[in-house]
């Protein structure tokens, strides 16, 4: 497959590249700063671009089988009002429509599930700006006719374990955390297998 990775310099995006290359896929990393990616591989193509730019995305996308988006906002901006993921989701789906690419796997967050309890209420308060941006991005994606999958993982860690559980429209039981690598594995699996089409998926270790 030819996979188009957005957010490729982040923790999850880096793991997506590693897993996809290990499975002999061709990977395009669409990033603002290609020099931040130290990995070199004949199957890896680095493309400099702005994820807000429909024009740049439309130029880079043709010929790919799927878009895997791990875009997110890092602290301290993550704890302030922002719309980055929503804006980039809008430009991405527009460019996909122009380019004839139909498959999208997007990372969101488990905080959007209506879980009960004080801990989840606290997370929803602390992560309210992230949640607002991600929910808006999800709405953008759902409004399209694309074959999308939205992944909602819980707290992410740097563990090397790539195992995960996936549940439609709910957080798996006893979900507390999972690794960036496991989220990346789910994304590549979903792209390869064509699973969870037009579905929201809760993830956990």
Outline where the language-model segments fall:
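N-terminal Rossmann NAD(P)H-binding glycine-rich loop of SDR-like oxidoreductase domains
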Residues: 3-23
């Amino acid at each position: 497959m030819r996979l188009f990775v957005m957010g490729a310099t982040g923790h999850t995006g880096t793991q997506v590249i590693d897993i996809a290359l290990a499975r002999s896929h061709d990977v395009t990393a669409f990033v603002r700063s290609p020099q931040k990616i130290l990995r070199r591989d004949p199957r890896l193509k680095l493309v400099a671009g702005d994820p807000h730019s429909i024009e740049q995305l439309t130029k880079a996308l043709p010929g790919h089988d799927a878009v895997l988006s791990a875009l997110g906002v890092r602290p301290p901006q993550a704890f302030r009002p922002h719309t980055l993921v929503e804006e980039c989701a809008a430009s991405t789906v527009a460019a996909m429509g122009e380019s004839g690419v139909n498959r999208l796997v997007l990372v969101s967050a488990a905080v959007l599930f209506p879980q009960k309890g004080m801990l989840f209420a606290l997370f929803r308060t602390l992560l309210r700006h992230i949640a607002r941006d991600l929910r808006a991005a999800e709405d953008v994606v759902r409004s399209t006719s694309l074959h999308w999958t939205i992944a909602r993982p819980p707290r992410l860690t740097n563990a090397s374990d790539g195992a995960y559980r996936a549940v439609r429209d709910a957080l798996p039981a006893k979900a507390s955390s999972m690794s960036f690598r496991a989220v990346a594995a789910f994304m590549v699996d979903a792209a390869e297998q064509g699973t969870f089409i037009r579905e929201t998926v809760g993830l956990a270790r």
